Amino acid sequence: MMKSIALALCLTHHSPMVLSIVDYGDSQEKTIDSLWKKPHGSDLTWSGFSRVGVTEAYFAVPVDHFLTNPPSLRLSQTIYCRRGSSYVETEKVEEEDRDDFLKQVWFLTDNLVFFFVDIEEYIVIEQLGDTVYLWDASSCYTSKLVTIDDENGPVTSINWTQDGLDLAVGLDNSEVQVWDCVSNRHVRTLRGGHESRVGSLAWNNHILTTGGMDGKIVNNDVRIRSSIIGTYVGHTEEVCGLKWSESGKKLASGGNDNVVHIWDRSLASSNPTRQWLHRFEEHTAAVRALAWCPFQASLLATGGGVGDGKINFWNTHTGACLNSVETGSQVCSLLWSKSERELLSAHGFTQNQLTLWKYPSMVKMAELNGHTSRVLFMAQSPDGCTVASAAGDETLRLWNVFGEPPKTTKKAASKKYTEPFAHVNHIR
């Protein structure tokens, strides 16, 4: 499978910069500290790497230089761009608006970390659109995937299919674009599902589920022309989190109305009444942190925002709350270990830390510090060992959190991904 890197570019009238790129590659032998030594850029800093450490590389690279002379990225390398003086001059937006808690803009595939920085404030001030680029690590070839114009943008959510071949791009104008990232081809645009921005996306094979600012959740079958096959109605404010269970039978949603819903895939309807299996109202702030447990299929962890700060654990069969843990700060994201009974939580004010918990005792095992603003996004590497975190401080950090991956058989290791809807023709 082609190795790809997706870039997020912040385009200004002054000096466009690459914001972030990470290449995990396909080698299981390289370590995170085997990074290239001579960066194409400046402002380079390094720090140690350990179970509670981080390895980082910061760069400022002009886009025109990068597109014509892309650096040879190696395993787990981060490119980062600090805002220059031209950006600082535009700080007319309130600080709390700079890292929108509700937007889902951070994703990981087999060999790819994609970090899309929300630049809505610069689009408003500079009247600019969003551009998404793909970078092929095997050939060092960079290509523009799509530029969203001011009228339709900015990009408010992005999510990869399970095989990492197709990308869904949610927009501020209520539309969702689907892109084939192997051929850099626009497959289709989904319309009519929402009335405002699409802030959450989740794939379930050929079903793309979208969550909007209008509170609606829509299931789209991307194989058919009339894509909308069902809706879930229950949230009264923006849907800011969506996660399908591993089986694909249950969907968890979190909203700005402080509510968590559990939905059954088979109950989605174009004429909804009371559809949810369970409705949880225990949180007292917005819920965007959702994580299905990999070792107990019915277990869901949820985290509340500012004013709540709790991690709640739910039995989604019975609807019972199994435990509630006060963390002391906003819970922005949650990740389960794939090999251990551990949970990682990402937080906001005051410490902006990542916290590692032992489940089910919820004994605090470690705190990972370094971010200076709330940690909005986390994603795991394919082996589950490395976690990447992105924060409002505009840094992407890589952590060796969960230890060695579980042993896999040759049969399992040789398993190849197939495109979820490869057997049907794409519809533009």
Swiss-Prot record:
Task: Kindly state which keywords UniProt assigns to this record, in alphabetical order.
Answer: Cell cycle, Cell division, Mitosis, Nucleus, Repeat, Ubl conjugation pathway, WD repeat
Compartments where located: Nucleus
Query: Which residue intervals correspond to the WD repeats?
Result: 106-145, 150-189, 193-230, 234-273, 282-324, 326-367, 370-409
Superkingdom as given in the UniProt entry: Eukaryota
- Which Gene Ontology biological process is one annotated for this entry? protein ubiquitination
**According to its UniProt entry, what is the function of this protein?**
Component of the anaphase promoting complex/cyclosome (APC/C), a cell cycle-regulated E3 ubiquitin-protein ligase complex that controls progression through mitosis and the G1 phase of the cell cycle.
Q: What protein is this chain from?
A: Cell division cycle 20.6, cofactor of APC complex
Q: Which gene encodes it?
A: CDC20-6
